[in-house]
Amino acid sequence: GSGTPTEAQTQPQQGGAHERVDLPGNMADALSQQQGQVDAATQGMTGAASTLPTAPATVMSGAAAREATRPVQGTAPQQHKTPAKTAAAKPTATQHKSPTTVYTPPAKPSSTAKAGAVASSGSSVQSAPGSHYTLQLSSASRSDTLNAYAKQQKLQNYLVYATKRDGKPWYVLVSGNYASSAEAKRAIASLPADVQAKKPWVRPVHQVQQDLKK
């Protein structure tokens, strides 16, 4: 009968072993349940990702692996959807902005036409120092005749400006911007013969600028 006590001794050990085995069994069940939730979350996320471009989808699958320990089904896809939207929105915004920045600068110089000047061809008379001199070539009651005349004579650096004579509009054609009256007089010799025949006269630039303000 010496075998019986040994069986009796092993019984509790086996019972104890059963209890210890049960705990891992419960843990395994819990893990498999959690794994099921993770799988569901991953499937849900990959389902949502299928509508997105491939690049965000790869980001999301990486995120799904990170989220496996705590499967939060609702927030993970939303977090990844919003960057995809903003990333898509930004390029279109810049595409629309760039044409406007390209086309606005050329419009500015044309809109800033100087007051008082009717027509000019690169004239620096308006911005020249008051101590400089210019040549008055002609004057008339209409600006278009003076402009036509200046173009006909192929004048460079001319200005047709509006002033008043006896309270009525009067237009003057001046040309050139010279540092001294002597330089202006010498320039008369280089003018077309028809222009010289009108006997151009030297005028201080400050007088012309005063006329422009009238």
Swiss-Prot record:
This is Cell division protein DamX. The gene is damX. It comes from Serratia marcescens. The chain crosses the membrane at residues 44-65. GO terms for molecular function: peptidoglycan binding. Its main location: membrane. Non-essential cell division protein. Signal peptide: none annotated. GO terms for cellular component: plasma membrane. Residues 1-133 are annotated as: Disordered. Keywords: Cell cycle, Cell division, Cell inner membrane, Cell membrane, Membrane, Transmembrane, Transmembrane helix. It is a single-pass membrane protein.
